[in-house]
Amino acid sequence: MLRWLFAITLFSLGNLTPIHAEVIGREGQGWLERENGQLILHLKGSPREMGLQHGRLLKDHIQQNLKTLLEIKGNQALVDFGPLKLKPRTAIEAIIAIQRAHVPDWYLEEIAGLAEGAEVPEMDALVANFIPEMFHCSGFALMNSATADGTLYHGRVLDYATDWGLQDHALVLVAEPEGGIPFVNVTYAGFVGCVTGMNVHNISIGEMGGGGLGHWHGVPMAVLMRQALQTCETFDQTIDLYRTSPRTCQYFYVVADGKTNKATGMEASWDRFELVLPGVKHELLPEPVHDCALLSAGQRYQLLVERVKEQHGQITAESALKLMDRPVAMKSNLHNVLFEPQTTRFWVSHAGSDGTPAADRPYNAYQLSELLSRTPDRKDAN
């Protein structure tokens, strides 16, 4: 079960601390660097070009990641698919056949380029990129009077199978799509879609899933998130994209806009669209807290409510990070991200190779505007 936590809160983290970065590969307009142990992948160009850059610069990582996902773990697990229990690949191939009519050409072109560059079968790359459709999530949001200052903050906790080794292929992916909006995607080698991201127009988006398995006739969740980041400049445009697009299953989202200091949760399911406003009671959220949208379930939801109430009006950067500590973050905590959309700053922590939860590991600090200003020839990269 894939569970993801989101936070939107208001506070400020201090200045970014420059860290030595090393350029380790180039391909066309794309390039790869390593900073403080974290891979940062820069992609630029057409969908095909970006896919080729991704595949060639991270060929070994992609081959290893897909082998684990599709051959090793994919042959061990069974998933529910209607009344049947199927291996994940079999189920995903059936989903692809249903959803293909709703997948934009640019997405398939980028996956084809990635497969060519990484020297993997195109169907393997396609199946891996549809894995997020099998899983569902949870989340929370805090803002305005709930915090110590007025800076909009959007945080995210991803809990998912650290024993699958995704953290060994973790990326900060900085994309400049031809004709589109530049954005950052916190992701893994071989993945083209997005589940955690922010663009240069100060829009950040996160996803959390519910039920509705089997309702696949729509745009895949990770594709829709990626599309929003590279096409939407405003809060209203983002909401309208979700409202008007054919959707799948039951998904909840958090959308934040640093330009207007505005954020909301929303349900964008196959048959329902509803904004989940901060501080407003919802049938799934029985304990509303002023200026907060706490989207989670069970004991984790109760703990979030307790933590937020205890610090309401006093939440700072440090205390906001603590809101996402275990057991709000599960033992399988794969990555944590905090976005400050107004400044495009963000902080990332990944699980350790030994399975140490991301919440128990240090954060690396970045700023999207600064990442986009970098070149592989800059002196401070050597």
Predicted features and spans:
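Sec/Tat signal peptide C-region and signal peptidase I cleavage site
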Residues: 17-21
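Gly/Pro-rich turn-and-neighbor structural signature
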Residues: 114-117, 122-156
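Bacterial N-terminal signal peptides
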Residues: 5-15
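C-terminal, well-structured catalytic/ligand-binding subdomain of enzymes
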Residues: 22-110, 114, 145-153, 157-382
